[in-house]
Amino acid sequence: MWIFYIPISIHILILAFRYGGIRQLSAINPCMPNGGLVDSNKAGNLLAIQADLPETVAKTGLLRAELPASLAKLDEVMTELELSFPIILKPNSGQRGMGVSVIDDSTAAERYLTTYKDTDILVQEYIDGEEFGVFYMREPSSPNGFVFSITHKLFPKMTGDGTSTLERLILEDPRAHYMARFLLKQHAEQLERIPEKGEQIEMVEIGSHCRGSVFIDANAYLTPVLEARIDEISKAISGYYYGRYDLRVSSIDALKQGKDIKIIEANGLTSESTDIYDPKNSLIDAYKVVFRQWYLAFKIAKQNRINGERVSSYREILSSVRSLNRGPS
């Protein structure tokens, strides 16, 4: 997989030379530390939307690391947000679904809080429905932004044959077996169960490619109404010009109409245009998308820098990367 990123890395280095250095990218989203290099202010983005357009974001609260996490504090946040289980818990800093969990009860919550005891944790309403990744961009000189890409995130399901255990279904599935270690752990309590013929078992509840979700190019779903709605939501975050929203909607038709949108995450600089992972898209198509994405990133960042936005030092950038790599204590 790392081989795929070699041409991209070379392309980024060329752009960095042309635009005055790689750290210029830190000016791309003034609302986020280092422009969202490690997406270290997810709560800030979601709470900004929640303040202006509460109907468009999953209810979100924050458990701060300096206050030892406990079930009592979690209960306070849930009461304030009028939430009940299931809920989503996830680190305020992280990528690719790292640490994101669907929590069904207080026992699971206590286990999670123990694992991530020294981490700022997002407490979020669980939203059912179809999940999409919508990549948004806006040049600072332009009054309106645009949707760069849309990805439909499909969650793999096992279909029972009436004779095989769930474990065997996972191991013999052409896609799921690549994620067998993760899926077997997630479903450890029912691996010996034999699903009835035709019964479907959902394997994952989180829209992350590295956790088994299938990404489908959904750019055909873009409409002027949807684009205008995403632009409106984005402007609720002062200083947000570039990144991917992960959102859920009740249906594909609702997405096209810009209705029932619930933002569950707003990512920054290192967002991927995840439509490139659609198996139907060629390698050449993927590179075209990613090259254009990074060209626009440098272009937007340069405009922000010219407008006086701060550029992070290399020390600050390296510190953020190290903090992400350390993970939970």
Segment roles from a protein language model:
Residues R23-M32, L63-A69, D75, L255-K256, ...:
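Short, flexible, glycine-rich and Lys/Arg-enriched loop motifs at helix boundaries
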Residues S250-S329:
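C-terminal active-site "lid" helix and adjoining low-complexity regulatory extension at the edge
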Residues M137-A236, N267, T274-A297:
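ATP-dependent carboxylate/phosphate-activation module, predominantly the ATP-grasp catalytic core
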Residues M1-P30:
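A transmembrane-helix-recognition feature enriched in membrane-embedded lipid enzymes
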